[in-house]
């Protein structure tokens, strides 16, 4: 037994590593327990089912992909942030092959409330960060946002465009950057 691998964070880290090496098919309660060096029961102490484990793993992958950049410059203006987000998506697709198209987007359509809730929580975090960038961007025109065209609505639009790019596996942000320039600068 490996007592250091029994934390929820370590179990999720191990699940991410299994996905990187073997894809989604490689993740099971048994395979994660084996890789952690713990009993199956230990995994069940944290996750009641494989679906719950996968849901939490999906959320942790989103967090891993969009971990806060150490380069604060990417959060000083909207254009830098959008470039960074698209780069993170591309890097995430390379680190977690098939994550976006085959599994993560499927959680939105899943019948499990927990899976949907975890995905929405991860997405809400990304949206909130984008709103903060928009609110702090000193380059934005004073009249850019109105009652009908709010920071939040624009952030949701940018996020929707990002998800669309994700499905298409098109990580060139140039069109979105031009939309940002024309809409708010």
Feature locations, PLM:
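Short, basic, alpha-helical segments at the C-terminal edge of helix-turn-helix-like DNA-binding modules
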Residues: 59-66
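Helix-loop "lid/cap" segments that line or gate small-molecule binding pockets
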Residues: 86-94, 102-110, 133-134, 178-184
